[in-house]
């Protein structure tokens, strides 16, 4: 999703043609990054507006569209009987509309002609913004009427920002384009399970556990991959966020929590916990549930005590060996190190407890004690460490903490030199 497209109009004030080149350059940069980071697992899926996996949006103005949804809207407004998918395929790239023959060609009809994306999408969008910002009620009212939108007289008395948001939402409607993009390009949980399990499960692939996970079987053995810990409002304990790959997790259920160091030969990194509560996230809200079947993302209370980064949850009794889901992998390393100590030495235990919570909350943070007794924190960069220190001071330890000089680790210098 390309957000803040409206800033090309309101802040950068780019001409429509330049805005098109900016958007195209951004997508090319994204595809270059995808290609450079891609693995053999699942192949490489590049973003392309014609394919329908790019959504243009503005959070401030409350609109979003794909080429397909915009083409459908355009044909509906103008009463044209034509396949919107075919029309959408002609709205990107070096294609030009020839009004005489009413066809799209790679050759422009005249010198200086605009590409189809500029002519059919950007220019109307620019016109809407210029009319609303111009604060000429008559012009806005007549133009919106052409688009089949009627606003109340009270709406035209609003300030520019709320009026623009109301006008754009009335024109573009609900986020059907974004929803259609998700439905079309994101596979269902069951369809994606086999590829996912091959990639993240560390055990043998011919076991009955793997078979149940690949089928997303709600009646199979419980297997949950915990990937993130979220603090409670008082930051005293955490709730575990994970995906149920097989089985059904329920409140009151006793489970085994396997840490990142667990293996069937070494069961030291394992604890037994009871699931006390379950929720599903809906934006910033939590909805309490009693159970969650395979395929669900669920928030779990009561199992966080032994989890540091990620974990695997499995049932108490199972006939075969259970292996863990592999820990998360990142393209960056925590190479920037700072030393921290409490301003008041007597508050050291509080800071140490806060550092433990920081390690649980930040996936790429590493906290350790040096041989000198110094407490150090490693992060990916200055901004990352700033966020860590803010949370350490205000949420997790609630003590004054002073920081020694920041420096890069030997590992980072090695990468720079080479």
Which role fits each region the language model picked out?
Residues 1-418:
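Structural and coupling elements of P-loop NTPases
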């Amino acid at each position: 999703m390309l957000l803040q497209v409206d800033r090309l109009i309101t802040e950068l004030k780019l001409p429509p043609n330049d805005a098109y080149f900016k958007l195209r350059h951004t997508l090319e940069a994204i595809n270059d990054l995808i290609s450079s980071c891609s693995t053999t697992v699942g192949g490489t899926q590049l973003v392309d507006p014609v394919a329908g996996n790019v959504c243009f949006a503005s959070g401030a103005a409350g609109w979003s569209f794909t080429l397909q949804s915009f083409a459908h809207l355009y044909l509906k407004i103008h009463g044209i009987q034509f396949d919107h998918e075919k029309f959408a395929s002609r709205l990107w790239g070096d294609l030009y509309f020839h009004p005489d023959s009413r066809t799209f060609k790679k050759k422009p009809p005249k010198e200086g002609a605009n590409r189809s994306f500029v002519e059919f999408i950007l220019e109307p969008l620019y016109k809407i913004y210029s009319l609303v910002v111009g604060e000429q009620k008559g012009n806005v009212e007549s133009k919106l009427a052409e688009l089949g939108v009627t606003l109340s007289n009270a709406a035209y008395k609003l300030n520019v920002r709320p009026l623009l948001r109301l006008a754009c939402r009335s024109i573009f409607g609900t986020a059907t384009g974004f929803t259609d993009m998700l439905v079309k390009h994101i596979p269902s949980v069951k369809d994606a399970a086999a590829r996912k399990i091959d990639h993240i499960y560390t055990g043998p692939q011919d076991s009955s556990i793997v078979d149940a996970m690949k089928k997303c079987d709600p009646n199979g053995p419980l297997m949950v991959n915990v990937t993130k810990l979220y603090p409670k409002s008082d930051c005293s304990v955490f709730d575990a966020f994970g995906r149920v790959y097989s089985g059904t997790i329920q409140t009151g259920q006793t489970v085994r929590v396997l840490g990142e160091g667990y293996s069937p030969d070494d069961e030291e990194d394992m604890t037994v916990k009871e699931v006390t509560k379950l929720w599903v996230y809906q934006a910033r809200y939590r909805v309490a549930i009693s159970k969650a079947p395979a395929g669900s993302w669920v928030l779990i209370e009561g199992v966080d005590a032994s989890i540091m980064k990620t974990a695997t949850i499995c049932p108490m009794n199972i006939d075969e060996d259970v292996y863990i889901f592999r820990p998360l992998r990142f393209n960056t390393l925590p190479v920037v190190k700072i030393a921290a100590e409490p301003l008041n030495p007597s508050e050291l235990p509080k800071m140490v407890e806060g550092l433990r919570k920081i390690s649980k909350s930040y996936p790429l943070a590493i906290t350790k004690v040096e041989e000198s007794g110094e407490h150090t924190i490693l992060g990916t960069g200055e901004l990352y460490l700033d966020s860590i220190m803010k949370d350490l001071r205000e949420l997790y330890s609630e003590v004054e903490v002073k920081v020694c000089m920041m420096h890069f680790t030997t590992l980072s210098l090695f990468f720079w030199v080479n």
